[in-house]
Structures are given as C-alpha cells and as structure tokens.
Amino acid sequence: MLSYCLLVTGPAYGTQQASSALQFAQALLAEGHRLKSVFFYREGVLNANQLTSPANDEFDLVRAWQLLGETHQVALNVCVAAALRRGVTDAQQAAQLNLAGANLQPGFVLSGLGELAQSVLTCDRVIQF
C-alpha cells in the first residue's frame, strides 16, 4: 500500500485536470492505497470556491472534493496566495484583509507552500494534475 499526495492545478470547470484528479483519487482509494492530501494550486484553488454553482445536470466537482475529504479523512489544502489572487478566501483572511465575505468551501483549508513541501517529503508518490 502506497501513500499518495495530489497536486491539482486545474480549475473545477473548463479543463479535465480536476475531474481526472478526483477520479484518480477515488480509484487509488478503492485499490487500498492511502491518499494523505490534495494540494490545490494556481487555477486549482477554484475547486474550493463554495460559490461555484454548476447546472442541475452537471457534476458538482467542488462538493465531490469536499465529500472525498470528509469520507476518507483527506486533507484538502488550498494555496493561500493563489486563492487570494483568485478571490477565494476564508473568514479569517477576509476579516484581516477587510473583504466583503468568505467563500472557501467547508472541508478545505487555506495553507502555504510549506504544506506542499511536507507532502512531497512524506508521501510515496506525488501526482500532479
């Protein structure tokens, strides 16, 4: 059994990166491997935007990530710098920066690149999407 960490750099919609990462995560968990964390970076931080509202007949990727994190105790880390540049923030950052409100999906956590570095050091495999 291997431990994996995923790096997601694609948005929830518009490319296949995030949906491929989710399918890969589900497959490796089904095979008995351990998914320690998912780090959302660059456009990937948009996977943590709770204001994303897909059409009724579309797959809700943001909520699917949230469910995966809750069900399998997977850390869903979001790069704080990349998130703030793209309008994704939690209540603490919103208050510090005098922003109108927070929109980070529950289950996701703003974190720094140190979290990614730690994952690279502690996981058997790091896969980028």
Swiss-Prot record:
Q: Which cysteines are joined by disulfide bonds?
A: none
User: What's an example Gene Ontology biological process for this entry?
Assistant: tRNA wobble position uridine thiolation
Q: What EC number(s) does this enzyme carry? A: 2.8.1.-
Which spans are transmembrane here?
A: none
The answer to whether the entry has keyword Nucleotide-binding is no
Q: According to its UniProt record, which residues of this chain constitute the active site?
A: C79 (cysteine persulfide intermediate)
Example of a GO MF term: sulfur carrier activity
Output the superkingdom of the source species.
Answer: Bacteria
What are the annotated GO cellular component locations? sulfurtransferase complex
Q: Which UniProt keywords apply?
A: Cytoplasm, Transferase, tRNA processing
Query: Where is the protein localized?
Result: Cytoplasm
Mind telling me which Pfam families this protein's record contains?
A: DsrE
What does the similarity note say? Belongs to the DsrE/TusD family.
Listed under subunit, the entry gives: Heterohexamer, formed by a dimer of trimers. The hexameric TusBCD complex contains 2 copies each of TusB, TusC and TusD. The TusBCD complex interacts with TusE.
Cited function? Part of a sulfur-relay system required for 2-thiolation of 5-methylaminomethyl-2-thiouridine (mnm(5)s(2)U) at tRNA wobble positions. Accepts sulfur from TusA and transfers it in turn to TusE.
Q: What is the designated name of this protein?
A: Sulfurtransferase TusD
Q: Which organism is it from?
A: Pectobacterium carotovorum subsp. carotovorum (strain PC1)
Q: Which gene encodes it?
A: tusD
